[in-house]
């Protein structure tokens, strides 16, 4: 993670930190446009690492909104063995992509789309589900990265939006 922090620092970002070893990087930038930031980071990582790295930028206020969003019944979220995952996308999915995703709904897996995120309620262990990140990317027609809602809540709490 030290190398990742250095790469982001070399882009001119300040207050660069990593959060758990899964590629979450927190930074301050004068540029506010997420797509501009994503493109610049992706280009720099490709040049520095020699391979493509899909990048998904969210502001602190967006992260707070995502952490508070409740697309499913609370009883489903509290049930033993159920987990909620949030997939980050580079853009809002099309209606056609949403329809493709909903084909994967089962008694185990349910989905809700909210802006540039897909919420996945898994009513078993992720490893026991027939759904996967690869199927999500195929349905959406774009790259995605997934985090457990607990990670998102921790990020939002540790890095609150400034008022």
Residue locations for each model-derived region?
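Surface-exposed, charge/polar-rich loops and edge strands
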Residues: 1-163
């Amino acid at each position: 993670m030290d190398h990742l922090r250095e790469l982001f620092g070399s882009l001119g970002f300040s207050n660069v930190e990593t959060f758990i070893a899964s590629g979450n990087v927190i930074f301050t930038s004068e540029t506010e446009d997420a797509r501009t930031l994503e493109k610049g980071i992706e280009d720099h990582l490709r040049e520095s690492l020699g391979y493509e790295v899909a990048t998904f930028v969210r502001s602190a206020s967006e992260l707070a909104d995502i952490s508070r969003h409740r697309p499913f019944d609370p009883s489903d979220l509290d049930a033993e063995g159920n987990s909620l995952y949030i997939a980050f996308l580079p853009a809002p999915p099309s209606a056609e992509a949403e329809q493709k995703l909903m084909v994967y709904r089962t008694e185990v897996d349910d989905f809700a789309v909210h802006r540039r995120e897909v919420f996945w309620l898994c009513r078993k262990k992720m490893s026991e589900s027939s759904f996967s990140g690869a199927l999500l990317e195929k349905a959406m027609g774009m790259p995605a990265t997934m985090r457990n809602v607990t990670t998102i809540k921790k990020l939002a709490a540790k890095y609150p939006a400034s008022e």
